[in-house]
Structure formats: structure tokens, C-alpha cells
């Protein structure tokens, strides 16, 4: 098999396996076929992990493939890698340019407020990187909320910002993936719901009263903030109204319908909805 065929087969297999164990399955596939590791790591979303930034009072930050270099991850708070890389490796490690780093800091501060307001806790991290030598850039905005071991929400927003030739408009493209795991631990019967949902969105914004690089920072952070807020709101509604209701319909068909089982099913569905709304 060619490398492309192995990659396609691995992706197809991962889509059919238990989504709660995707990280384990991914590691096993990479160990089996190391040559497809880079492709799988960049295309398969796994639940976000958390590290502490010892250079920023042990403040926690989220880790994914986009802020990884070798086995270390860059913190958005101190702009350093943890665990610390060697001086030789650090020379080749990716860092945002100074103007983009300023925007990265502003976005992290803005989304911290968003997280407190809409998630009432949890974690958020934003990472940006330069695209060629232009003012265009790309990045990822991460959110993680775990109400308990049984209720987890991870949202990954991969963004790109492209300016027009005159520099008067910027087009934002956002690919969002939500990884959701809900579970009830009822003594009578256990029910879990896991999976991910991916959607793409784009928006073109006119840059008004923006003539310097410094003025671009609040313009970009404001535009991205409103766009992410709108995307997450729509995805939450879609998950709750469409997917949960459809799951309940399928569950009812598969289960034997008697008064006791119907009552139990409704209780389990209500518990899942309640856990979701807490995230």
C-alpha cells in the first residue's frame, strides 16, 4: 500500500472505532505505521490536554498539535515551550512575529473573559502563526470545559485571516470541531454519548479606521471574538436540538417500549441534556 492509501485506511478505521478512546487508537496506528504520523496528527482531533506554565505562576494552558514542537508545547502566557527544549531545538522552533505575538496576547485576554462569561470556568488558549511575509496569519482558538469526568466539551477553532490587496478588507475562515462526551452513571443503566462535529464558516470584514499595525490588534480580536461566539452558539443549539433529539428517537426504537423502560429512557435523556447544559 502507498502512504496515501495507508493514511486513508487509518482515517476510515478511526471514524469507526470508539470515539472515547481515539487518543489510544491514534497512538497505536502511529506505532504501527510511523510514516503516516504527521498526517494523522494534523487531521485527527483528540481531546485537549492541559499543562502548567512555570514561567507564568503555573498558569494552565491547553495543548494540541498546533502548539507542539517535538514533545513540548508552547504556552501563550510566557511564549516558552514546556518541557524546556534544548538550545539547538529552540532555534528551529516556531514562534509568532512580534506584531502577531501582540495580537496573540490580546486574543488570549479577550477569550479569557469570554470563557468566564459563557463557560463559567474551564480553560482557553489561543495560538497564532505567520503566513509568509504578509500581514495574513493563521491560528487556533481552544476551549475546554470538564464539568466532571463524565461531561467534557472541547472546541477547536482553526482560523485563517487573509487581507485583500488594498488592505481594506480581511476574510476570516474558521473550521470548528467540537469533541463532546456525556455519560450518566445511573445504577440501573449506563448511557454514554460521544463524538465530534465539524463545521466551516467564513466572514469578510471591512477594516474601518485602521491605518497602523497597532490598530489591527483590536480590530482582529473583536472580529474573531464575535465570530467565535456566534459559531459556538449555533453548534450548541445544533447539538442539543438536532442530535440529542435524533439520538432519543433512535434509542426509543431500539429499546423495548414499556412504561418502565420509557420512563428510564426519558430520565437518562434528561440527565444527558442537563450535563450538556452545564458545560
From Swiss-Prot:
One of its GO terms (biological process) is cell morphogenesis. Signal peptide: none annotated. GO terms for cellular component: actin cortical patch; F-actin capping protein complex. Its main location: cytoplasm. One of its GO terms (molecular function) is actin filament binding. The keyword Signal does not apply. It comes from the Eukaryota. Keywords: Actin capping, Actin-binding, Cytoplasm, Cytoskeleton. It holds the Pfam family F_actin_cap_B. It is found in: Cytoplasm, Cytoskeleton, Actin patch; Cytoplasm, Cytoskeleton. F-actin-capping proteins bind in a Ca(2+)-independent manner to the fast growing ends of actin filaments (barbed end) thereby blocking the exchange of subunits at these ends. Unlike other capping proteins (such as gelsolin and severin), these proteins do not sever actin filaments. Belongs to the F-actin-capping protein beta subunit family. PANTHER family: F-ACTIN-CAPPING PROTEIN SUBUNIT BETA, F-ACTIN-CAPPING PROTEIN SUBUNIT BETA ISOFORMS 1 AND 2. Component of the F-actin capping complex, composed of a heterodimer of an alpha and a beta subunit. This is F-actin-capping protein subunit beta. It comes from Kluyveromyces lactis (strain ATCC 8585 / CBS 2359 / DSM 70799 / NBRC 1267 / NRRL Y-1140 / WM37). The gene is CAP2.
